[in-house]
Amino acid sequence: MKRRNFIKTTAAGSAFIMTSGAFAFKNGVTQSKKYCYQSERKIPVAYDVDVVVIGGSLAAVAAAVEAKKSGAKVFLTALEPYLGEDVCGTFRLWTNDNSITNTQLGKIIFGNGLPTPMHVKRTLDNALIDNNIDFLYSSYVTDILTSDNGQPAGVVISNRSGRQAVVAKTIIDATPRAMVARMAGAQFGNYTSGKQTFRFTVLGNHLKEAPGLTGKIHDEQVQLKFASTGNTQGSGFSEADIRYNAIEYTIQIDMKDGSWTSFAEAEQVARDLTWDSDQVESADLLFQNPPDKLVGQKRWNNAEVDLEYINLKVFQPRKIENVFVLSGSANLSEEAAESLLQPGKLIRIGQRIGKEAAAIAGTLASSQTVKIKGINRENIVSGDVGEILEGLRPSLNMGEVVAEETTLPVLGTYDVIVMGGGTAGAPAAVGASQQGAKTLVLDYMHGLGGMGTLGMIGKYYHGYRKGYTNIVDLGVKNMDPDNPRQKKSLGEWVFDWKTEYFRKEIRNAGGDIWFGVLGTGAYVENGQVKGVVVATPEGRGVVLAHTVIDSTGSADIAIAAGAKYCSTDGLSVAVQGAGLPFKNPDDFYNNTDWTFINDSDMLDVWRAFVIAKDKFKEQYDIGKIPQTRERRRMIGDFTVSVLDVYNGRTYPDTISAHFSSFDTHGFTEDPFFSLKPPAHSGVDVLAFVPFRALLPKGLEGIAVTGLGASAHRDAMPVIRMQPCLQNQGYAVGMAAAWAKFNNQKIRYIDIKALQKELVKIESLPEHVLTDVDNYPPSYEKIQQAAQSVVNDLEGLETILWDKERGISALTDQFHLTQNDAHKLVYARILGMLGESTGWKELIAAIDTYDDWDEGWNYTGMGQFGQSISYLDSLIIAAGRTKRKEALPTIIRLAEKLTPESHFSHFRAVAIALETIGDPEGAEPLFRILEMPGVRGHVMPDIKTAKKLTPAHKNDVSTRNKSLRELILGRALYKCGDFNGVGNQILNDYSKDLRGHYYRHASGVLQMFSGQKKVEVEL
């Protein structure tokens, strides 16, 4: 359990400092005339380079590579979860200009005709990796760092790891609207109100015409060589020859101003005008030739551009020598910009700017003092900004930068804000807006529905499918009942229909939608969450609300506000398997499980995206959301346990019903499962979640939905299913609206009145209206279970539900029984609970084994039932008694292990020996680690990760090997170590790109080093 200290930040505020004209959304900000306060704080430095490139366009990558070849140290950060955002994000892949193949990068991408997004993205990844250039995805710039002489000295970026500083001598701004140059104080023309011209590309649709809407069908069709089979097993795809027409629409959209809210609405208008039920794909981004150009050091007025001789000062802001604008926002004529914005045309300019930026950096000394300037304004909303400022990883921080106290603009005020438009978030926005609340839903993706749509899990696996979920399923099906794309059952769907269904439901109810927005923090006053701090492509600000619904899936906003949370740490490395799928147009179900991914660790997310493109390099495209089944979870007023689920616990404040088997995708940790494994996939459990489990302890004005809710990790497999979370989100949206209308804090809404409404639509069974808490079980019931437990562990869930009284009843029965077999049952249960009562019986039972029984290897997809053998459980139970007398017995079997032995046997030995913690256990563990193939599975860098990751979409070999090495190394370290091998393994994994291994290894080193160190939040 962690508590993230409440950090009062000041970052994006400086993004709004330099000049009143620094932001495209300045008009909207001026009208609001409200600001939020950020106290002084320190921003961790993640990178210190010569050249930082902001943006992941083709030209941006070309600039980064050329700067590196010129001797500069370079870092690049992309806005999207991929590189090539100028062509892949806008879907502008078509070109007739052969001159773009004059550059090597252009030739690789376009030389063989119309490229696939996968080819573009992977080519750009490899261009940076091959040149040893660090880069990240999904990060927005929020601030400019300023040197002691007042010049730009780098940037601050924001992502799901928080905010980090990047110190740099020169900046290449390759964002479409030159947002970094604007932050640095560069001057731009005016973005006039009225009709503005945008372009938007879709795939598979019928050509439409309407006032202000014209379209052209590209001559060359999109060709798919593979099609998804929709199966979890096998490769998941088959060979095919499928072709789609692509349409580029030109749209005249009425823009109120150049504010972010205007651009967000423009995207929704474009989708309103172009979507139809035959659409199989669409661009993420609107394309516009920016009308408000940079005021540069030079002006290019000609229509034609000579790529070799155009003066680079056209791309430099006036009076700012170390910033370049590498986009259509440069000081170009409209015709010249239009020419350069054709796919690939800017590559050569990027190369020239990269070389020049490196040369300028070579003339500049490193700044001794770098900071983020603040600005004070009036009309401040009381409160302060809470955010996560731990760096990409604490161990990688390269110092800190002071961010002066400042103010952030209020970008909007709503009754309800939903941060995250995924499985629970989109329904929450529907629920709130349909109740009449002024609602805003924000999402980093450019579509709603989360894992069930963009995440490519387009069919249900179990789940409570009544209630609001049934309304959704029927609504999606009825969008076009006779369309041949229609699915056969309500349990699966056309992914873009569901995305569009949620979008229309929210807009029809009056709700607002902002895509392409990161939630980076919370605005808090005395424990009351008053709004969400957001990073947009145009800068950073605050959106205020009466109630915030945190549907990020990782409790990002709640944790930023100060909530405690649980995740992998020094005590636990258990996490459900994850994947990242390929994505062809019209795919709806590409379920993968080949790794672990920590969504909140941007290095890990980056690693997963890079590797996934290698695994699926022949496919049309890669997914945009990691398929994670388990994430960090906040600590709420109540935490749902495994035994609450197994015992059918009822609550007076039930908010959602959940129906599923224990789909664990890996091994479990709760002692109950070590004794009585989860049932097979066909055995479903009906479980309930109380409203208290969605309310972060100690905070008001916020509720958390989905995977970020307060529950033990082993309970999550039952309560994470999509149908259940859709119902949950809708209910919480209703609750948030009611809280506003009654001027209440959401914690105190009339839950019984809400339950009645949910019962009416069948989201909840009627009995919840009269349910009371059925915990704890009576002692009489526990005693009865203690007698029956000897019969195949009958009643074990009752005994362990109330652990303290359960131990008492078990101990009594252990001493009363004269039956040796029964005595062993009690001894095994008590041992698992850390009680030493039956240690002799456990040792005797283990000694009856000459060799190992049938064990278990790590399994992700399709993992049900036991993850340890009976002998494994005896050994773990013996170890947990902490009796040293068990060591010879455990070591005897440890010496029989071979590299081919099952993973569960290694894990059992490790847990037993490390729990006893005696130095006698060290050498046997060392001997195991010295066996061939047991060590050497760390992935410290991306090239190693690419080399070690097999191609299969459900690979488990890397996890079996890495987990085995890490768990054995941990146990060796905790037994006192041998030849420093345990320490070495933990240190190696503390640098692993895979976030959960990093967290675990780092946590073990901190918790068990015996040395007092500065506390670092992991």
PLM feature segments, named:
Residues M1, G21-V52, G56-L58, K373:
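C-terminal segment of N-terminal export signals and the immediately downstream linker at the start
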Residues N5-N27:
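N-terminal export signals
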Residues Y37-I43, D86, N98, L114, ...:
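Flavin (FAD/FMN)-binding glycine-rich loop and adjacent Rossmann-like elements that form
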Residues S990-L1018:
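Eukaryotic acidic, Ser/Thr-rich intrinsically disordered low-complexity regions
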